């Protein structure tokens, strides 16, 4: 059995006096693509932020490859091997595509360099002809691809994607899905927070559902596909 890359246990997270997460727990193994699914406001983004240290939990812990990372600063967590693509992408709009990629370049926590820029352009062929374009002039879908590619340039042990299909045209969502399926096929480990269930059903290997700040379901993706009652109860809009 493959090793656990990220383990989240019993997280309680508050915004002020309001509790948002209640004992949240999940784990992602090496090579898995895990979809964290739920309706708007269910706690998906807060879970991602808690993992990255952007919303520190009051209780619980987060471990990366067996090492405790909860309680550390976000930049230390990133250096330990987590790559986070937030919902707003946070590209550098005044720089070129290639400059954005170079800015994101660093070796992995064990000195590995699995994502040289040549490989990035092989996996993201739409970016190479745009490499000299100013990033702020890209379409939303191109910016999303750039944000994912730039994060991979940091050689993360785990790629975290917060709502990668949000606000994109259906044809662009399809392209992003194809890209994520390719990442899965080459063994990347990915955790996706998404409201768009149909987007994830075709690319994830496993699914966890969060509802009102609590984990209510976790299974292989085929089991979720076969369980219409669960989909209707927690994911239907």
Regions found by a protein language model. Give the residues of each.
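ABC ATPase NBD coupling module
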Residues: 56, 68-89, 93, 113-117, ...
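Helix-to-loop junction immediately C-terminal to a conserved catalytic motif
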Residues: 52
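The feature captures the beta-strand-to-loop junction immediately N-terminal to the Walker
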Residues: 37-39
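ABC-type ATPase nucleotide-binding domains, specifically the catalytic core motifs of the NBD
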Residues: 16, 72, 97-115, 123-128, ...
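ABC ATPase C-loop
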Residues: 151-152
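Catalytic Walker B motif of ABC-type/P-loop ATPase nucleotide-binding domains
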Residues: 159-163
């Amino acid at each position: 059995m493959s090793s656990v890359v990220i383990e989240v246990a019993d997280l309680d997270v508050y915004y002020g006096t309001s509790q948002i997460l209640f004992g949240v727990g999940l784990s992602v193994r090496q090579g898995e693509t895990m979809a964290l699914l739920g309706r708007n406001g269910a706690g998906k983004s807060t879970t991602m932020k808690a993992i990255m240290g952007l919303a520190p939990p009051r209780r619980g812990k987060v471990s990366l490859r067996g090492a405790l990372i909860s309680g550390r600063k976000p930049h230390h967590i990133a250096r330990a091997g987590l790559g986070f693509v937030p919902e707003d992408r946070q590209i550098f709009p005044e720089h070129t595509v290639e400059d954005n990629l170079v800015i994101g370049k660093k070796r992995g926590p064990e000195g590995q360099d699995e994502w040289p820029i040549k490989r990035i352009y092989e996996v993201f062929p739409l970016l190479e002809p745009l490499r000299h374009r100013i990033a702020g002039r890209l379409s939303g879908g191109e910016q999303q691809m750039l944000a994912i590619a730039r994060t991979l340039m940091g050689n993360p042990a785990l790629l975290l994607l917060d709502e990668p299909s949000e606000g994109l045209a259906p044809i662009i969502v399809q392209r992003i899905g194809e890209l994520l399926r390719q990442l899965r096929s080459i063994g990347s480990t990915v955790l996706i927070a998404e409201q768009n269930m149909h987007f994830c059903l075709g690319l994830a290997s496993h699914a966890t559902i969060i509802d009102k700040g609590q984990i209510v379901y976790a299974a292989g993706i085929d089991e979720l596909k076969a369980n219409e009652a669960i989909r209707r109860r927690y994911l239907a809009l």
